[in-house]
């Protein structure tokens, strides 16, 4: 009975609660390891740390193929409405995502974060400036597609997935359906791996804290504060500026309504897709154009990913600072562009934004092993980070839709 209850605790129910339990158990193991080592004759934290290593290797294995099929399927099957103000909404979505990534770059430089990693590699090939980063980017783009998958060249994987996705837009419906089914199949594998996240976090926390000490928690707390702080800045400073640009009046009543009615629900559901009915209901109560919001809100749940762009950017810069890689601000600016593109592929996948971190890390020569460890760090702080990210993403969907609709009404008056 006890074994059955323990199994249910780790593999069923709310993922956030299970990760929190894994975090607490990992902390306890790290605390008791020095005492038990003399009794047991081995390092308990080191032994359970293998669980974290297996989890990280699983993430490394699935990330390249996930990005490849997900982006390809999304582009091949994308249908954008013909409404005149849809273009305005899409511009807001993409501009908002880019400005969120740019805000994250600035925050990453102003408040640099470092976290404890299992390995700190000697990064002798660290990029010297934006020129070298761009040259590396071009070389990675023209890589052989199979080699890109085998070597985890995420930029090459992204380039080929975009190219094939655009080509497949003209394919038959049966071919598009097959591509979508393939993406769904890979996503299901990801869900299985994510189900083991509590055990992975348990192993990672145990080994990290036993090795680095409780001081390692300070790095996690600082990183989380930078992430959440940047998301709040985007929600209450950047987004209102964009809304004012469209409607030319005080944006905060509308911003607050969207955060209260949509963001709060999304914070607890942790799913932009699950929050679509909430956003549609809010759009209806705001008397927005139904033909517009019925298309723009589901589309926003797919491509409007400001929170994901912030997560990818901040965690990538944390890896860069941890490894003491010197990069220019313009190189980091390129990161914000890549993070914006990456974020559009994060929708509908468990831990989607975290699984795109290796792609961004590859810009600066960070190994896929270290990048995978940053994914693990993301899961550790994900108890709060993921909820805040989803709240920002989902509330922005209805906010930008409302701004575009109001701007359209103002033109007609």
UniProtKB/Swiss-Prot annotation:
Its main location: membrane. It catalyses: L-serine(in) + Na(+)(in) = L-serine(out) + Na(+)(out); L-threonine(in) + Na(+)(in) = L-threonine(out) + Na(+)(out). The chain crosses the membrane at residues 19-39, 61-81, 89-109, 148-168, 189-209, 223-243, 297-317, 325-345. Keywords: Amino-acid transport, Cell inner membrane, Cell membrane, Membrane, Symport, Transmembrane, Transmembrane helix, Transport. It comes from the Bacteria. Belongs to the dicarboxylate/amino acid:cation symporter (DAACS) (TC 2.A.23) family. This is Serine/threonine transporter SstT. The lineage of its organism: Bacteria, Pseudomonadati, Pseudomonadota, Gammaproteobacteria, Pasteurellales.
